[in-house]
Each structure stands twice: as structure tokens, then as C-alpha cells.
């Protein structure tokens, strides 16, 4: 698992290889990832936007931005957690992802919360990140 903490908001990522959706002979490698966001701060926040940097083993970068996550813009009161799962296809057997969520307080303050960098490694390959 990979963790990042920004302003007492913790993001934990657990990636996993989806062998049944992958086809290495056609250069298709697919990973899922589970993310848990915990609001350990004293203020409520809403996840309004996301930014992802997805880099394959050849250094090809895909930047993804958009509102919320998986069609939602969850509000987390102090002590709340929010969990979701998603996925990422690559044309190479490994890569990495990192990014941030843009959060908004009830008072309208916007700030970024880091998503830790994490490896996307096919089974049998050495891990890129620990």
C-alpha cells in the first residue's frame, strides 16, 4: 500500500494487476486500484476535481483531469472516510501513477491533497516503487 498525508487528509492506494482483463500478446496490461481517503482534519471537505499523471515504462505520460471521482464529488466531514475503486490500462508491462485531488472546504477554500506515487507492475516484474 502507498500513503500520502496532506493537511490531515490521508490517501491510501492499493494497486492490483487485472490478469483477466490484460492481454500481453496485444500489449494490453490493466490494473485496478482501491483508494481510501480519510479526513482526519477538523473541517469538512468536498473532493471537487482530480488530476492523474500516468507514466508507462517508456516514459509516455498521460495526464487525466476531471470533476470528482467515479462520477461523485464526495463530502467528507471530520472523521469520515471515502473509498472507491477504478482502473488503468497501459500498453507496457509496467508504469506508475501519481496525482492530487482538489478539495474545497465549506468556506470555499481550495487546496490540493496528494495522491502518492504507486507502481503498476505486471506479475513477475521487479517493483518500480516500494
Curated annotation (Swiss-Prot):
Transmembrane residue ranges: none
GO BP: error-free translesion synthesis
InterPro entries per the UniProt record, alphabetical: ApaG_domain, ApaG_sf, Uncharacterised_ApaG
Superkingdom: Bacteria
Gene3D superfamilies per UniProt: ApaG domain
Pfam families named in the record: DUF525
Domain ApaG: 3-127
HAMAP family: ApaG
Protein name, entry field: Protein ApaG
Species annotation: Rhizobium etli (strain CIAT 652)
Lineage, uppermost ranks: Bacteria, Pseudomonadati, Pseudomonadota, Alphaproteobacteria, Hyphomicrobiales
Amino acid at each position: 500500500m502507498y500513503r500520502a498525508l496532506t493537511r490531515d487528509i490521508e490517501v491510501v492506494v492499493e494497486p492490483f494487476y487485472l490478469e483477466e482483463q490484460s492481454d500481453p500478446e496485444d500489449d494490453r496490461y490493466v490494473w485496478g486500484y482501491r483508494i481510501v481517503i480519510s479526513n482526519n482534519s477538523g473541517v469538512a471537505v468536498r473532493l471537487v476535481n482530480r488530476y492523474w499523471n500516468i507514466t508507462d515504462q517508456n516514459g509516455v505520460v498521460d495526464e487525466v483531469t476531471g470533476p470528482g471521482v467515479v462520477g461523485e464529488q464526495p463530502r467528507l466531514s471530520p472523521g469520515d472516510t471515502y473509498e472507491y475503486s477504478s482502473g488503468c490500462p497501459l500498453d507496457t508491462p509496467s508504469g506508475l501513477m501519481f496525482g492530487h485531488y482538489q478539495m474545497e472546504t465549506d468556506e470555499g477554500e481550495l487546496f490540493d491533497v496528494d495522491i502518492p506515487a504507486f507502481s503498476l507492475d505486471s506479475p513477475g516484474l521487479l517493483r518500480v516503487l516500494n
